[in-house]
Amino acid sequence: MDYFGMLEEKTKELYAIAREARKQGKDLELEPEIPLAKDLAERVEGLVGPEGVAKRIKELEKSMSREEVAFQIAKEIATKDDVEGQPNDYEVQEANADSAIRTALAILTEGVVAAPLEGIAKVKIKDNSDGTKCFGVYFAGPIRSAGGTAAALAVLLGDYIRMSQGLDRYKPTDDEIERYVEEVELYESEVTNLQYSPTPDEVRLAIRGIPVEVTGEQTDPVEVQNRDLPRVETNNLRGGALLAVAEGVIQKSRKIVKYAKTLKIDGWDWLEYFTAPKSTKEEEKKKEESSENKPKKKAKYMEDIIGGRPVMSYPGAKGGFRLRYGRTRDSGLASMAIHPATMEIVEFLAIGTQMKIEKPGKGNCVVPCDSIEGPIVKLKNGDVIQVNDVSKAISIRRDVNEIIFLGDMLVAFGEYLRGNIPLDVSAWCEEWWAQEIEASEYFKETHDTFGIDFNENMELNALLKLDIDAKKAFDIAKKTNTPLHPKFTFYYNDVTKEELNDLHNYLYSLIDSPEDVFKSDMNRIPIDYHKRIIEVLGIPHHVNNKSLIMSNDNLYTLMSVLNKSLSPDEDMETIEAVNMISPVSIKSKAPTYIGGRVGRPEKTKERLMKPAPHSLFPIGNYAGNIRNIVEAAKKGTIKVTLAKCKCTNPDCKVSSFKALCPVCGSRTELESSAAKNIKLDKLLMDAFENVNVRRLDEVKGVKGLISEDKYPEPLEKGILRARNDVFTYRDGTIRHDSTDLPLTHFIPREVGVPYEKILEMGYTEDIYGKPITNDNQIIEIKIQDIVVSESCGDYLLKVSKFIDDLLIRYYHMEPFYNAENRVDLVGHLIAGLAPHTSAGVLGRIVGFTKASCCYAHPYFHSAKRRNCDSDEDAVMLLLDALLNFGKTYLPSTRGGSMDAPLVLSIRIDPEEIDDESHNIDCMKRIPLEIYHKTEEGGVKPSDVNDLVDNVESRLGTDNQYHGLMYSHPTSSIHAGPKICLYKTLQTMTDKVESQIALAELLRAVDQKGVVEGVLNSHFLPDMAGNIRAFSRQKVRCTKCGAKYRRIPLSGECTCGNNLILSISKGSVLKYLDISKDLSHRYPINPYVVERIEILETGINSLFESDKSKQSSLDAFF
């Protein structure tokens, strides 16, 4: 049986168990409530589409692109007339249009996200002022989950449906246009920043041009001045509509124009204002000249420097992360690799920690790779060493005086391709050097390999182990006419020509020639200011008795390259001047540095509601804030709002809130909900007896139910969860959240699973085609297998024990998991779910990692419409979801069906998932042509995409599922820190002190700038906001949680308990002392110091009386 067949067979087995349990009638539904879907068409029908639409989608997919299918389906649904009512009746048209736009949007978003359900509130046929009919699409906040492109296409779909139904254009009034202008400005000032901030004129142009009304529900309690407009139902902000206009139509204008032309939809020509080049090259040049004296705009990641999250490197700063192209087995899909030694030395970077970066893209997650270059550090004793070993990094990190170079950042070609960002010049590295040798005329003629194994399976590890000394490196360079080996190439561009000339004169004053270096003690150089030049060049050396000692090879190289003075030409870069005098070609070792700062910490933690309940059973305020059902039961009878269910037995007809009638045992029907008195003590006692559990001290419930029908969970489930120390989420499932990281290959040893177990799961051979016979072989992971964190494995083990308890004690069936340790869970099925989606993805546990993350195939993450730039997703045991998930428990508010497994994708089709995964590199080495293209400058990745092997080139073939190779090996996917320093430090003072201490070590960071950044973008705005919030706050009851804008005259809550402030004085003061301390210790901008003083005055005025205190005459003597 093939892999997908195995998954499907196991899924059917679990469904059979769940179906048998549900048939007992103890749950509201008699069948599992998560339908299966094998492909996009079935997911769409399962989520939103009318019955039978899956078949039609599959027919159209044979000859159309996905976008064309979406629009064709929309047209067919919009023009049908078999809805209740008369043909051409507006209600029928609205119903058709509503179904059409939701189904088409579901197709465009892979049938995964909740936007088709929640992002579009409704559609409506409305009146223009001239009496014609127009079409309005009401967007809600969750449209954000679809992304800008899908939101834009939803508007275009609305226009297509409008035309299909023969409706006129939307004709906005001047007041309606100005309402949008005001809302955009209010949204940014009062709510949050938009990804694209349109100007007022751009908003006016868009609203006049869009042929449908883009409107929506109120999303924020912020009132507008343009009030009481006849066609706008709310006087508050319509966030969904603004997102659709600004981040959709305007920001994605190029895509709309493209699709409008392809589908021959007229009326969108006005968008060329946004897509046309704004000026000619001459005008751009003039603009550049006129703005030469203007300050440069800050890099995006530097705009918000957060306390405790250090800046690792300023934009393009020398000594930052060196750009190196390639992919290791745990990088790609927005995650990028650095050396684990770098992670250990800086301590703020652990596996899965987010970084906000300068390029490419906005952010990433860091993962380890030990076949790239580690950091170069200066120790307190003056030694300069390159650290390429984790244990060495741990042993010396307290002795580090300066981090001269942070090491490589391994960036996949696909990361540039994703945004079609022009390629930056690559680092000069071993894998490039080897290909230059291979391409040389000398090699082609003589086949002299110099001991290098040139074949298509050549691995970087072999190159790194090559024993090449300096003389041999120069010999190879001269014979092959290729640049000098990277090992003997220094960071010449990081120093000036004057400094190199100074160093040249100094060295040749001590040593006559490079050959003399190999004589006794000639590599001992007296220490003076030239040491700093050698440090910045990145040359390792030791200090002993006031002498600098470097290796003979490095000194020979330095003197051979700097054999005469460099040209003083000011227009010439240092590396160009070096090449003019060097006997061999010298490449720039680090032509591109990447800046970045620490972002969100890595995470692996069980999903808990606040406070965390064991059962979705309401107990009101009868147990106070602890919400313990056992405590509430001591009250005897309590009054709560519950579902009203009527017994279906005609001889009984008793009303209750249970699925089974408590009197006759027949099924009940849900009718409504109402407040009622229940004997909780008896219910709880019966529940304990039903599951044969001795009385527990604590079983936590909820204050009230937020679902529409108010149907509670059976108390028995809560008791069994409490018994196994697990907690439910709002839909009845138990979840564990982890940071997403990609993985294309694993080693049985590193995931803690014996190879025999791996064989049982259908794995047969390693990446070299050899049979699996030990725990150390590298194996390509199957696309729906995942490696969860050890803490996730331990929590799921508890969940499995709960499920077995549930099957035995509640459903009176055989246990299923019988797991004694987490390894017993290997091979079992899970459902993965992203928070903004409504479709789970079937997965299988294949192992465990010590890191705080969930490793999975890039396809698995993309199937959830996620990448790996710090996204966090949930994992749940599939049988738990099938037994306990209930749509009835979902919140009735907008967005309630988001983050719920309304459908389960059981098979991942690479062609149907998010296309970001199509950019994943599959190359054993980066082609030489790509390296050369990076040197040209400004080359777009799309122009050279045919030179690379990636997923996109494999789609539709069997190779899309396997053979996704990597260029850079790593010995372990969990090398380096597992928890970043930010999470281990308890106080903000400790975090900031550590942040600034690291800034003092980093050559690529300005310490004063970091201090000012933390104050300006974090502490000062936070204090100002807290002062404002303190003065506007409500008071809160300590028992029932009721809130009051003003303290009642009685001074207490209506329930008789005390009232307290909801915002404490401490929250206002928390950053004041540390801000003052930083302003005194560092020479920061006087303006920032004044801001601190003004805030301090305001705080003192808030908490202390401004009345002058009477003084005695003694005070004046």
Swiss-Prot record:
Residues 279-294 have a biased composition (Basic and acidic residues). Its EC number is 2.7.7.7, 3.1.11.1. It comes from the Archaea. GO terms for molecular function: DNA binding; DNA-directed DNA polymerase activity; single-stranded DNA 3'-5' DNA exonuclease activity. InterPro entries: PolC_DP2, PolC_DP2_cat_dom, PolC_DP2_central_dom, PolC_DP2_N. Keywords: DNA replication, DNA-binding, DNA-directed DNA polymerase, Exonuclease, Hydrolase, Multifunctional enzyme, Nuclease, Nucleotidyltransferase, Transferase. Residues 279-299 are annotated as: Disordered. It catalyses: DNA(n) + a 2'-deoxyribonucleoside 5'-triphosphate = DNA(n+1) + diphosphate; Exonucleolytic cleavage in the 3'- to 5'-direction to yield nucleoside 5'-phosphates. Possesses two activities: a DNA synthesis (polymerase) and an exonucleolytic activity that degrades single-stranded DNA in the 3'- to 5'-direction. Has a template-primer preference which is characteristic of a replicative DNA polymerase. PANTHER family: DNA POLYMERASE II LARGE SUBUNIT. Heterodimer of a large subunit and a small subunit. NCBIfam families: polC, PRK04023.1. Belongs to the archaeal DNA polymerase II family. This is DNA polymerase II large subunit. It comes from Methanosphaera stadtmanae (strain ATCC 43021 / DSM 3091 / JCM 11832 / MCB-3). The lineage of its organism: Archaea, Methanobacteriati, Methanobacteriota, Methanomada group, Methanobacteria.
